[in-house]
């Protein structure tokens, strides 16, 4: 895949996040709870990541759309959970800071691991496995934080 095509696929994924972010609340009500929606979205994110890297290139745009929808949903619900769970505005700020710190650290670790895996073997498989592991962690924490009285 050329750099231009890869940039296009990334742009499609980012553009697909917008409708998911805006409709995540309605999807939450339709699925009957935030925990189920987070698990479904994280599973879709993991599967679409595998699809982008391993399915034929004809599927890349569709997988990027699914990836964008999944990540947009997770981001929207994650931000809403912090606000819904906080008892005070200052608690919401502390939760936001903590989650951003953890999220950016995990994102940086994933980038570092991905680069080191590519330099050593040139395979996308370790990246997909690590990303899937992070998605499973997201499913577990999403289900736990969606329970009443979690904080």
Residue ranges and their predicted role:
Residues 123, 129-151:
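Multi-pass alpha-helical transporter architecture, strongest
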Residues 86-123, 131:
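A late C-terminal transmembrane helix in Major Facilitator Superfamily
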Residues 73-87:
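Intracellular juxtamembrane helix-capping segments at the cytosolic ends
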Residues 20-33:
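Helix-to-loop junctions at the C-terminal end of transmembrane segments
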Residues 7-17, 99, 103, 134:
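Transmembrane alpha-helical segments of major facilitator superfamily
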Residues 58-67:
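Paired small-residue
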Residues 2-10, 92, 96:
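Juxtamembrane helix-start elements in MFS-like secondary transporters
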């Amino acid at each position: 895949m050329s750099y231009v095509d890869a940039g296009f696929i990334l742009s499609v994924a980012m553009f697909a996040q917008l409708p998911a972010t805006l409709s995540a609340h309605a999807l939450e009500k339709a699925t009957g709870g935030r925990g189920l929606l987070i698990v479904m979205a994280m599973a879709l994110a993991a599967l679409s990541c595998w699809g982008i890297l391993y399915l034929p290139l004809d599927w890349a745009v569709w997988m990027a759309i699914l990836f964008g929808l999944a990540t947009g949903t997770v981001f929207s619900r994650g931000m809403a959970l912090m606000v819904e769970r906080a008892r005070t505005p200052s608690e919401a700020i502390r939760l936001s800071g903590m989650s951003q710190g953890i999220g950016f650290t995990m994102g940086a670790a994933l980038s570092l691991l991905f680069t080191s895996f590519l330099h050593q073997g040139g395979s996308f498989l370790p990246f997909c496995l690590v990303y899937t592991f992070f998605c499973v962690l997201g499913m577990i924490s999403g289900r736990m934080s969606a329970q009443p009285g979690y904080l």
